[in-house]
């Protein structure tokens, strides 16, 4: 066998070389072409939105990581290969029948450089590409600062654990990978070239092979010693005691922590024993040291903590874990901002002591009670305000508030977006889908506390023109008319949640000056986009790039695309924010608002950490279902701040990031990493700030934690006796928890309307009400949490019990049977409202939807009844149930005649007006009169009109209305043929 000279190598013909070269070029193009196209498109898109610096910073960071890791891994592996190759035996017996690696050895000897460099570079590049995903850790390490808070065990600033430690661990992991790969490369190379030979009954190892393998093995063990040292700090995020609490417990501090130090010492001794193999031929010392390390890891690192936990800690857990539970409580409250000045606790009896009309706060609260449910009314909005088949609203509408004529009112709001999935027939042609149908039209709102008329006749509810929202529409048709309740100067919507559902998601807009418009605007007009958004495809190179990206040749050949054309991509507001700020976690629910005459999407964004010492882990995102159907828990965090409010302009797609938490050290770190990307809080316009809502995702995390972390005493925390639970949703059969709800309630100090996100809480493994949590959204008190704590022995019913009490009421049960003959019933939000100076009022709208008799007919929900319930002013825990077509009448039933009418006069009259007569469904109202959305003025309450007189007058008026209803029914019956 020839080992030194490769001999004469065969030469390929010129044509064959050309074919091989062309084939390799095509393969490279197929492998890397799409990625290069994506990189160029990202370059263009980030430049369009003004965040190219973010793209460049992330790219350079990842390239630097690739280069660093690739150099380290490739260098160490190449050095190992080179040493093993140069120290190979000079003579290796060439016996293929006894040496199975002889053919491979011959092949390697022909191209030793390709063998060495090829393996080293390949491993280095692969490791570098994988390591590049750790760019976040690198940026946090480089730009991280301090928190000003030290951990209670080591006395280090929290910044060390969240900014530095993850980086150190990442570096250590890649050094591990490099050294292990070098060890394996050395082992295989020595085996290939005869430095290591395995024969029957024994093996042979040359001195060079022994030294090299011992050095790399010692390096691995030495790195393991460093890992044990870092493990000490990571104990502060230990999950041993979960779900009771997160963080180091008694066993971690008194067994695991000393064990790590012992293992550090043993690992160092073991590494030294491996290094002695450089001078000693006997490998038994390193072998015994390795066995000692493994045995110590099992006994000291595993068995000792296990025995301590089982026989010392668990029998006395309430006492021995007390200081560590206290650490967990303090850290969790700080990490999630559920302690200190951010949370106000108040004792609350749960039983009303006054009439609502005697409490100014209650007058405001009941007047603003929300009857429209954004989860139910999307189809109603779509059917009545759709205008065209290709327009639609989001599956779940949103809730916001607007001050109209000086009065604050909450609205159900939605954007009339283009729905790509609703295009049919020729509308799905490429030109129509991407060039003609490009945008939505208008902002639609409806006062949340009223409908157009009360639905009184249970037998003919579906045929009545009642129970529908009173729409305030701001669209193209109403533009410039002066009749818009919420003025919008640019109602066209090119960016939104629904429009982004196109597959693929892009629209081609723009045209040369003076060219004929092509985009559908209204039935009588077309439009040409003039916004700043979009990537230019006016040159042939960009057109070719996008034709490649979307695999669509029409980018190249369509005459509809000209020199001024642009392509709009990434049209989902949430996606746009995620792309320009990949270091933020976005809320699942962007919502539209009107600011300065423009429709913009507000996206709540969070800074998060997952290594905050002692802080409880929680899931900021809901369960995620994989394509294979496996349900996994969402992103786990141990620190969260709603530090950024982002906006996306619905017309031109402009993304703006605003700082919203000056005290967040994580946001300050990211602002140093990406300077100029986040505007300071001082630059937030007041009109925009007035529409900020407390985000639902954050509130859901906080309420689930407050269920436990309202407890101050560690022993009581351990017993769980004082814990609360998030109630199950009584209107959902899927065993889901009750979602929080936005409400406009009276402020305790001023009695003025205050916009809040709220939730009821029940006892642990009980259904009785235990607490009521609300988060302020008003600018002056934004982020403050108010917790009303009920007595532990309360008999005030929780949401599930109240739901059962209401639907089992004889009036409800009997009429429900009647309604279900021709309707489907939908129960809306079950709202819990503090009222009557200590009581809790439950309000639940009941919607009916006519059962469709044919596949082509469309049906949609309408408000038909309002259920209310309040606890009896006694200690037994009984409840009163109100059930009527209007909130006012339902309140009369539980508080006495006239009470509901007086208390809800600002918002109740419009909802309780008698129906104007039988008729079909309410026709779409493109531009309603501006006054229809205003709450009617409250009745005068001067000294010359006693409350009793007002109540009597209203009761008499209600009787007259009932007589009129009976008279109308009699007239209708007389006019019906055969009647």
From Swiss-Prot:
NCBIfam families per record: PRK00068.1 (NF000825), PRK12438.1 (NF009097)
Region (Disordered): 898-948
Keyword NAD appears in the UniProt entry: no
Membrane topology value: Multi-pass membrane protein
Signal sequence interval, chain numbering: none
Subcellular location: Cell membrane
Low complexity bias: start-end ranges: 902-912
The keyword Nuclease appears for this protein: no
Official protein name in the record: UPF0182 protein Mb0065
Family as reported in the entry's similarity comment: Belongs to the UPF0182 family.
Family matches, as Pfam families: UPF0182
Pro residues biased stretches: 913-946
């Amino acid at each position: 066998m020839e080992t030194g000279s490769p001999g004469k190598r065969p030469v390929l013909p010129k044509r064959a070389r050309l074919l091989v070269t062309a084939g390799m070029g095509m393969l490279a193009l197929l492998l890397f072409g799409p990625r290069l196209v994506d990189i160029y498109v990202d370059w263009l898109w980030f430049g369009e939105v003004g965040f190219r610096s973010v793209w460049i910073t992330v790219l350079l960071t990842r390239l630097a990581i690739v280069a660093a890791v690739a150099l380290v891994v490739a260098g160490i592996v190449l050095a190992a290969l080179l040493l093993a190759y140069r120290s190979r035996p000079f003579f290796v017996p060439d016996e293929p029948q006894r040496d199975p690696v002889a053919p491979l050895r011959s092949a390697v000897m022909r191209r030793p450089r390709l063998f060495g460099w090829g393996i080293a570079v390949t491993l280095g590049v692969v490791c570098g590409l994988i390591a590049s995903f750790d760019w976040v850790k690198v940026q946090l390490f480089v730009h991280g600062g301090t928190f000003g808070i030290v951990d209670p065990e080591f006395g280090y600033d929290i910044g060390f654990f969240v900014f530095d430690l993850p980086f150190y661990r990442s570096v250590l992991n890649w050094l591990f990978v490099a050294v292990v790969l070098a060890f394996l490369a050395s082992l295989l190379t020595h085996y290939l070239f005869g430095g290591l030979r395995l024969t029957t009954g024994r093996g042979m190892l040359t001195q060079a092979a022994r030294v090299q393998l011992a050095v790399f093995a010692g390096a691995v063990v030495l790195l393991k010693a460093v890992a044990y040292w870092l493990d000490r700090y990571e104990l502060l995020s230990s999950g041993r005691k979960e779900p009771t609490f997160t963080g180091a417990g008694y066993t971690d501090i008194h067994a695991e922590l000393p064990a790590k130090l012992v293992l550090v010492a043993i690992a160092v001794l073991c590494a030294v024993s491996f290094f002695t193999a450089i001078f000693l031929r006997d490998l038994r010392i390193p072998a015994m040291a390795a066995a000692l390390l493994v045995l110590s890891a099992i006994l000291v690192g595993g068995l000792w903590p296990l025995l301590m936990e089982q026989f010392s800690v668990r029998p006395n857990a309430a006492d021995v874990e007390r200081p560590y539970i206290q650490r967990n409580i303090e850290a969790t409250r700080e990490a999630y901002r559920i302690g200190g000045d951010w949370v106000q606790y108040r004792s609350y009896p749960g039983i009303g002591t006054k009439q609502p009309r005697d409490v100014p706060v209650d007058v405001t609260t009941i007047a603003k009670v929300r009857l429209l449910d954004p989860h139910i009314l999307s189809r109603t909005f779509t059917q009545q305000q759709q205008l065209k088949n290709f327009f639609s609203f989001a599956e779940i509408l949103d809730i916001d508030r607007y001050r109209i004529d000086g009065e604050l009112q909450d609205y159900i709001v939605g954007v009339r977006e283009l729905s790509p999935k609703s295009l049919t027939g020729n509308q799905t042609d490429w030109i129509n889908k991407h060039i003609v149908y490009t945008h939505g039209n208008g902002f639609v709102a409806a006062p949340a506390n009223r409908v157009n008329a009360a639905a009184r006749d249970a037998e003919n509810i579906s045929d009545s023109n009642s129970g529908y929202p009173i729409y305030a529409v701001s669209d193209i048709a109403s533009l410039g008319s002066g009749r818009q309740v919420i003025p919008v100067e640019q109602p066209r919507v090119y960016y939104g949640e629904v429009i982004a559902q196109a597959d693929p998601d892009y629209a081609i807009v723009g045209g040369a000056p003076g060219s004929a418009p092509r985009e559908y605007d209204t039935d009588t007009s077309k439009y040409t986009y003039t916004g700043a958004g979009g990537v230019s495809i006016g040159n042939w190179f960009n057109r070719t790039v996008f034709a490649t990206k979307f695999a669509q040749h029409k980018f190249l050949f369509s005459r509809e695309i000209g020199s001024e054309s642009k392509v709009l991509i990434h049209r989902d507001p949430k996606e746009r924010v995620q792309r320009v700020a990949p270091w933020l976690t976005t809320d699942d629910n962007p919502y539209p608002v009107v600011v300065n005459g423009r429709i913009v999407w507000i996206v709540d964004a969070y800074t998060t950490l997952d290594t905050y010492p002692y802080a409880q882990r929680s899931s900021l995102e809901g369960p995620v279902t994989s394509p294979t159907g496996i349900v996994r828990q969402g992103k786990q965090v141990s620190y969260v701040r709603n530090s950024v409010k982002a906006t996306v302009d619905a017309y031109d797609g402009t993304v703006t990031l605003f700082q919203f938490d000056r005290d967040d050290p994580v946001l300050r770190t990211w602002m140093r990493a990406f300077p100029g990307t986040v505007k300071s809080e001082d630059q937030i316009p007041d009109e925009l700030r007035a529409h900020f809502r407390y985000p639902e995702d954050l509130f859901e995390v906080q309420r689930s934690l407050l269920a436990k972390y309202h407890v101050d005493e560690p022993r009581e925390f351990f017993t769980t006796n004082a814990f609360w639970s998030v109630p199950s949703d009584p209107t959902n059969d899927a065993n889901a928890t009750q979602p929080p709800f936005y409400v406009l309630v009276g402020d305790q100090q001023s009695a003025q309307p205050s916009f809040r996100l709220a939730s009821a809480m029940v006892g642990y493994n009980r259904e009785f009400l235990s607490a009521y949590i609300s988060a302020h959204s008003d600018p002056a008190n934004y982020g403050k949490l108010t917790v009303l704590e009920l007595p532990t022995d309360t008999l005030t019913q929780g949401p599930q019990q109240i739901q059962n009490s209401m639907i089992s009421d004889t009036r409800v049960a009997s009429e429900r049977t009647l309604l279900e003959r021709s309707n489907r019933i939908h129960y809306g939000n079950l709202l819990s409202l503090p009222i009557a100076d200590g009581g809790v009022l439950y309000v639940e709208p009941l919607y009916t939807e006519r059962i469709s008799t044919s596949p082509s007919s469309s049906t949609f929900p309408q408000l038909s009844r309002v259920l209310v319930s309040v606890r009896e002013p006694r200690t037994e825990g009984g409840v009163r149930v109100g059930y009527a077509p209007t909130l006012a009448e339902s309140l009369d039933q539980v508080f006495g005649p006239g009470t509901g009418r007086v208390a809800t006069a600002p918002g109740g009259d419009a909802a309780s007006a008698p129906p104007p007569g039988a008729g079909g469904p309410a026709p779409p109202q493109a531009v309603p009169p501006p006054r229809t959305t205003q709450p009617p003025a409250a009745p005068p309450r001067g000294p010359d009109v006693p409350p009793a007189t007002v109540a009597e007058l209203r009761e008499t008026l209600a009787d007259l209305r009932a007589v009129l209803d009976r008279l109308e029914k009699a007239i209708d019956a007389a006019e019906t043929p055969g009647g």
